[in-house]
Amino acid sequence: TRTPVNVTVTGAAGQIGYAL
């Protein structure tokens, strides 16, 4: 449940990529 910059930039796609 973190919010890295990657998620903020790419949105949902970034969140999925961060989880993987």
UniProtKB/Swiss-Prot annotation:
GO BP field: tricarboxylic acid cycle
EC top class, as a word: oxidoreductase
Record's keyword terms, sorted: NAD, Oxidoreductase, Tricarboxylic acid cycle
Entry superkingdom: Bacteria
Residues reported in the UniProt entry to bind NAD(+): 11-17
Keyword Oxidoreductase annotated: yes
EC number annotated for this UniProt entry: 1.1.1.37
One Gene Ontology molecular-function label: L-malate dehydrogenase (NAD+) activity
Catalytic activity: (S)-malate + NAD(+) = oxaloacetate + NADH + H(+)
InterPro entries: NAD(P)-bd_dom_sf
Family: Belongs to the LDH/MDH superfamily. MDH type 2 family.
The protein's role, per its UniProt record: Catalyzes the reversible oxidation of malate to oxaloacetate.
Name listed for the protein in its UniProt record: Malate dehydrogenase
